[in-house]
Amino acid sequence: MEPSTRAVFDLGRVRDAVAPVLASHGVTLVDLEWITERAGWTLRLTIERENADDAGGGVTLEDCADVSRDVSSVLDVEDLIPNHYNLEVSSPGLDRRLRTAAEFARFLGRTAKVKLARPAPDGQRLLRGELLEAPEGQVAVLVDGKRIAVPFADVAEARLVFELTAQPKKGQRQGKEPAKESGQKKQLAEAAPRSGSKRSERGSEKRK
């Protein structure tokens, strides 16, 4: 049964508590979420390597497991979360979500899907194309050769699109093709639940 009440605690204090742990592993926090799943509450940390130059964040499954172990130890000591919960640590994945203006700027030139809360000037609500430079407070996407700019506030969700580089046949030019669905599934490694009083651990690495 899904939990019916939400735990009351300061997620900011959790963020502050885990920051030194992440720094000791040479990773930074991309996102921190407290969510309800069928198995109960989950504290989900998304991490990446400092100065990572790839969309996946440069972290491995082993990195996620190591960070999960040490974060779990700190949270046990600090006792900041009153609920039983699962702890999940993952990389952003090659189809990473774009949440901030800085992330849009970081991945200029990459292909992305941008869902809009309100239609773009041409009526579209889903833009897929190359991310372009845009004035502050806007997002610009090159869609079928046309530049479409929308207010950043109108972006409901945005993700990078992972594209495989196709090997050209003789007489053909090299290009890119979208990854097939079978190659896009998230890979998740789950550890056995710990005997601790409040949480089980999951270290996960999103691959595309």
Curated annotation (Swiss-Prot):
Localization (cell): Cytoplasm
Name by which UniProt lists this protein: Ribosome maturation factor RimP
Gene Ontology annotations for the cellular component aspect, listed alphabetically: cytosol
Disulfide bonds: none
Function statement: Required for maturation of 30S ribosomal subunits.
Pfam families assigned to the protein according to its UniProt record, in alphabetical order: DUF150_C, RimP_N
Superkingdom: Bacteria
